Regions:
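Charged, amphipathic alpha-helical stretches
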Residues: 1-64
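N-terminal accessory interaction module
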Residues: 47-146
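Residue-level detector of bioactive/disordered segments in secreted/extracellular proteins
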Residues: 62-63, 129, 171-178, 215-218, ...
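A broadly conserved sequence feature marking short terminus-proximal activation segments
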Residues: 140-203, 214
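Cysteine-cluster motifs in flexible loop/terminal segments that predominantly coordinate metals
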Residues: 191-233
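Long, charge-rich boundary regions
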Residues: 237-239
């Protein structure tokens, strides 16, 4: 069962026309990581991504399929960090390919959550990240010092991908940064909501709650995601 493949495919289709740069992942490129949350005061900031009423979206799609190749890379849609001069719309999307999700259904669910939680282990120097899991928003406040020291999406992306290397069975990561104002950020926000809905549905299924398909609130997802209905009925039967 590939929970996120439809969203992953739609994301690639939507953003392909906006790609401005692609960089192969090199761990030597990684921007310094402080290992803890950093405070960037307003008086020290250059600008914010996803702040001050601008869209700010983040989500992670995991697949075992071949829609992603085996090369990890950072992909930019829009201007790079040194080129941005004011608060900007922003999205950061991780497309993760693994060779397999191992173990029981519960084990596989935990592996999906682990991939989604990698973002909480990345602390680029000179960046204050504020992530809201409830709304799938991400805001990034950049310091002027980081801009002066040469921060870029290529280097920040390498920092993120380095953190993903701890995932079991990892094949590749496509780390997308989006800053082009012409991108449909509402569509990306809807995709983020869809990712979270699938994770929530899988969690509900694994709890073993019995259900009547005709009245179940997850019926649209079961209709859309191949294998989800069978998994749901199996766990309801075993509850």
């Amino acid at each position: 069962m590939e929970l996120f493949d439809a969203i992953l495919s739609d994301t690639i289709t939507q953003l392909n026309p906006f790609i401005t740069h692609r960089w192969s992942y090199d761990p030597a490129d990684a921007w310094p990581d402080t290992g803890k949350s950093e405070l960037v005061l307003q008086r020290d900031m250059a600008y914010e991504l996803g702040g001050e009423g601008c869209p700010g979206v983040q989500y992670c799609c995991v697949t075992t399929g071949s829609a992603l190749d085996e090369m990890s890379e950072i992909i930019l849609c829009g201007p790079d960090l040194p080129e941005i001069k004011e608060n900007s719309a922003y999205a950061r999307i991780a497309l993760v390919r693994v060779s397999a999700l191992d173990g029981t259904d519960d084990d596989q669910y935990r592996q999906l959550c682990e991939a989604a939680f990698v973002k909480y282990r990345v602390f680029p120097k000179g960046c204050m990240l504020r992530i809201s899991p409830e709304s799938n928003r991400e805001q990034v406040r950049l310091s002027r010092q980081a801009i002066q020291e040469g921060i870029s999406f290529r280097r920040v992306g390498a920092d993120f991908i380095r953190a993903y290397q701890t995932l079991p069975n990892l094949v590749s990561v496509k780390l997308l940064f989006v800053t082009d104002p012409a991108v449909d950020y509402e569509a990306l926000a809807n995709a983020a909501t869809g990712v979270q809905a699938r994770l929530n549905a899988l969690n509900t299924i694994l709890s073993g709650l019995a259900t009547d398909c005709a009245s179940c609130q997850m019926k649209p997802l079961c209709d859309e995601v191949e294998g989800m209905r069978e998994l749901h009925l199996q766990h309801a039967k075993n509850a």
